[in-house]
Amino acid sequence: MNKNPIYRSEEEAKDIACGNVAAELDENSQALDAINGAGWKQTIVCTIAQGTVGCLVSYGLGNGGYCCTYTVECSKTCNK
């Protein structure tokens, strides 16, 4: 008999109060895949929407349209 409850067979899982742990983990992973695996089209749309919202918020906060990063070269020009 295997002591790890995840690797127990169905016969050995009958005496466990929580049931078959491996089947429950498989169901959970399938549910997460369904939630996270919405498809590449939705991912692209979400990325574009988030970028657009980020640009609008940045413009609303006073960014004059310059794209600045945290690099050393750009930090000097952004502080002007």
From Swiss-Prot:
Q: State the NCBIfam families in the record.
A: plantaricin
What does the record give under GO molecular function? lipid binding; signaling receptor binding
- Location of the Lanthionine (Ser-Cys) covalent cross-link? 58-68
Organism name = Ruminococcus flavefaciens
Q: What is the gene name?
A: FlvA1.a
User: Where is this protein localized, as stated in its record?
Assistant: Secreted
UniProt protein name: Lantibiotic Flvalpha.a
Query: Which controlled-vocabulary keywords does the entry list?
Result: Antibiotic, Antimicrobial, Bacteriocin, Lantibiotic, Lipid-binding, Secreted, Thioether bond
Q: Which residues are annotated with the PTM 2,3-didehydrobutyrine?
A: 43, 47
Record has Aminoacyl-tRNA synthetase as a keyword: no
Q: What is the lineage of its organism?
A: Bacteria, Bacillati, Bacillota, Clostridia, Eubacteriales
Q: Name the propeptide positions.
A: 1-38
Q: What does this protein do?
A: Lanthionine-containing peptide antibiotic (lantibiotic) only active on Gram-positive bacteria in synergy with Flvbeta peptides, which are encoded by the same operon than Flvalpha.a. Shows antibacterial activity in synergy with Flvbeta.b, Flvbeta.c, Flvbeta.e and Flvbeta.g. Does not show antibacterial activity when tested with Flvbeta.a, Flvbeta.d, Flvbeta.f and Flvbeta.h. The bactericidal activity of lantibiotics is based on depolarization of energized bacterial cytoplasmic membranes, initiated by the formation of aqueous transmembrane pores.
Q: How is it modified after translation?
A: The lanthionine formed by Ser-58 and Cys-68 forms a putative lipid II binding motif. Maturation of FlvA1 peptides involves the enzymatic conversion of Thr, and Ser into dehydrated AA and the formation of thioether bonds with cysteines. Modifications are processed by the flavecin synthetase FlvM1. This is followed by membrane translocation and cleavage of the modified precursor.
Q: Where on this protein does the Beta-methyllanthionine (Thr-Cys) crosslink form? A: 52-55, 69-74, 71-78
